[in-house]
Design a protein with these regions (language model features):
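Conserved anion-binding
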Residues: 26-27, 35, 102-157
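Structural preference for beta-strand elements that scaffold enzyme active sites
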Residues: 18-22, 60-63, 93-95, 120-122, ...
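Conserved N-terminal beta1-alpha1 strand-loop-helix module at the mouth
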Residues: 1-64, 69-82, 86-91
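Short, acidic/small-residue loops that bind anionic groups at enzyme active sites
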Residues: 86-93, 98, 123-125
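Basic side chains
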Residues: 11, 63, 99-100, 152
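P-loop/Walker A phosphate-binding loop and immediately adjacent motor/lid segment at beta-alpha junctions
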Residues: 4-14, 90-92, 137-153
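Conserved PLP phosphate-binding loop immediately N-terminal to the Schiff-base lysine helix
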Residues: 67-73, 93-107
Length: 157
């Protein structure tokens, strides 16, 4: 298996846009025609299932923000899982926008869980290298995983 960086570069150099599509589902922004009357998580799942073919034609990767899914509880997490699976089924790389930053066995558990669904994840380094090590272990060799460490964010302050 090639590295995450090599997989992303291959797609971009092969002619796909270098843009990673952020998936931050907001119910008020979804078309009313998407699964009308369904629960929020079902609407989100339906929207991204229907949008994924178009995304896959133009972008090499998606970046679902887990917070927008988690707010709907277990059903929201299931929607996150379904969205990641659909993206991968379509040949897209998945960057889990999870912003994890714990240490020790907690970080190891996060790494195991998130790399089950995503090819790469976002991390924040506040707690130091110990918070990144379990994730970096998944990036060594031919494991095909990657991390994006938050250094400067789009936060206005």
């Amino acid at each position: 298996m090639q590295s995450f960086v090599a997989a992303l570069a291959e797609r971009v150099l092969g002619g796909q846009s270098p843009i990673v599509i952020g998936l931050d589902p907001r119910l008020d922004a979804l078309p009313t025609s998407v699964a009308p009357g369904a629960e929020p998580a079902a609407r989100i799942t339906a929207f991204y299932r229907d949008a994924m073919p178009a995304i896959a034609r133009h972008a090499p990767a998606v970046k679902p923000n887990i917070a927008f899914f988690e707010q709907y509880g277990a059903a929201g997490y299931a929607a996150y899982e379904a969205t990641c699976a659909e993206a991968r089924r379509r040949g897209l790389l998945v960057v889990g926008d999870v912003k994890r930053g714990d240490i020790g066995s907690t970080a190891e558990a996060y790494a195991e869980g998130h790399f089950r669904l995503a090819d790469a994840v976002t991390l924040h380094p506040y707690l130091g290298l110990d918070s990144a090590q379990p994730f970096l272990a998944h990036c060594r060799g031919d494991k095909g995983r990657g991390v994006f460490v938050l250094v400067r964010t789009s936060n206005p302050r």
